Amino acid sequence: MRRAEIERETKETYVKIALNLDGEGSFLGDFPIPYYKHLISTLCFYAGWDVEINAKGDIEVDPHHLIEDTGITLGKAFNSAILKSSFLRFSNKVIPMDEALVMVVVDISGRPYLEIKDDKEILKGRLIKEFLRGFVNNSQMTLHIWILSGENLHHVEEAIFKALGLALGEASKEVSNLKSTKGKIW
């Protein structure tokens, strides 16, 4: 089974995540920031992952620490679980949500890189970037996000998490042979 359990504790946060890549898309647990709980559970639902999370932190100071550390912990769990198999590796998805249209492209490559094309600067200063950066760097994947249109911030961010979930669900599917001209990724 492609599962992992990762725990991260700092002076500012505590995050424990149990991840099953071959799940049903269920999200259990406690995350004290409702909007980000919504986004993370959306990602897991569309990826088909079962995730149990226990997270707490100094959100009265700033939610930044907890959101970033959750991305880091989920990325580490994903990396640990995905290495237990060969997988499709690549995927891309274009998802609308009302006026928002977002394209996500992933390569589970062993090379972390995050590119967000946001010409209108819709995500400027948003903590979603910290979550995604932590996730990408620790999952060791390449992630490109293009915001093609959108005005409502919630619609844009939710479209990103839906597209990312669908793309990761597909890219992480088990296959008999990993596609790499090098013969391996890590």
Curated annotation (Swiss-Prot):
Keywords: Amino-acid biosynthesis, Cytoplasm, Histidine biosynthesis, Lyase
InterPro entries: IGPD_sf, ImidazoleglycerolP_deHydtase, ImidazoleglycerP_deHydtase_CS, Ribosomal_Su5_D2-typ_SF
GO biological process: L-histidine biosynthetic process
Gene Ontology CC annotations of this record: cytoplasm
Top-level taxonomic group: Bacteria
Keyword Cytoplasm: yes
Reactions catalysed according to its record: D-erythro-1-(imidazol-4-yl)glycerol 3-phosphate = 3-(imidazol-4-yl)-2-oxopropyl phosphate + H2O
Keyword Transcription regulation in record: no
Pathway this chain belongs to: Amino-acid biosynthesis; L-histidine biosynthesis; L-histidine from 5-phospho-alpha-D-ribose 1-diphosphate: step 6/9
HAMAP family linked: HisB (MF_00076)
Designated name of the protein: Imidazoleglycerol-phosphate dehydratase
Organism per entry: Dictyoglomus thermophilum (strain ATCC 35947 / DSM 3960 / H-6-12)
Upper classification of the organism: Bacteria, Pseudomonadati, Dictyoglomota, Dictyoglomia, Dictyoglomales
